[in-house]
């Protein structure tokens, strides 16, 4: 999260990297994105050291240490670099054309980089508003700042890894709304740790990927009644895989005021559709209400409207 915020503040292009990529995939992605600075965790140091010479475009490698223990790497160390700065604003000119690269998982071949303009990304995420909550978008940055000064800032907990588009964009959404992104120290998903942090930080929104996250959360809540207070949550959002009705209903028993939101999106297109379940509005199977940016076209490029007999 610190790296993302720093990149945005300095008008640098952030690139997400899947830590499960093998050597040829990683070399391809870093070369394809024209990466010049690479931040990596110390556990990957032997692997990173092996690919240095194959990536001549990279001018600086920054190792994020495990605790205060330095490896034998000759690369720069993150905490040392942070200590050299004074925290003053960076003298750069920001532009609506600043970019975020969002690389897909490579399910259709090698990873593909989606180039999101900051202005487009901010607008597609609601421009400081929320159609789901009936909050109108802001006309400009000044209106957004005024609105943020009079309302509570969101506190988001993204449970999928931030290298994943779902986790990354939920973190960016929270930060661009003047809010907080809560991250967990564990290397894998631990539902009890997630619930403890929801309670401790009064998290207002949680991001998951279907039943793979929702079921363990529900099991932990059922197994530990009264241990975790999740009343601060107003929304749990999911994208990517199935989130079943029974799991949703079980979660709502622990907080009847939550919105449980299925989102229909992709790396290239955000906000195509949503489906919402609440304690007052039960649903058997998620049916998505199309977002304003969702269009369907036939083979001739003619837009099709809901109810059309023709496939698109």
Description of each model-found segment:
Residues 99-137:
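Conserved AMP-binding A3 loop
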Residues 123-159, 163-205, 220:
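Conserved AMP-binding/adenylation subdomain of ANL enzymes
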Residues 295-312:
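Conserved beta-loop-beta connector loops within the AMP-binding
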Residues 85-103, 109-110, 146-156:
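Conserved pre-ATP/AMP-binding loop-to-beta segment of ANL
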Residues 5-11, 32, 164, 175-176:
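Short hydrophobic alpha-helices that are characteristic scaffold elements of the AMP-binding
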Residues 9-82:
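Structural core segment of the AMP-binding/adenylate-forming
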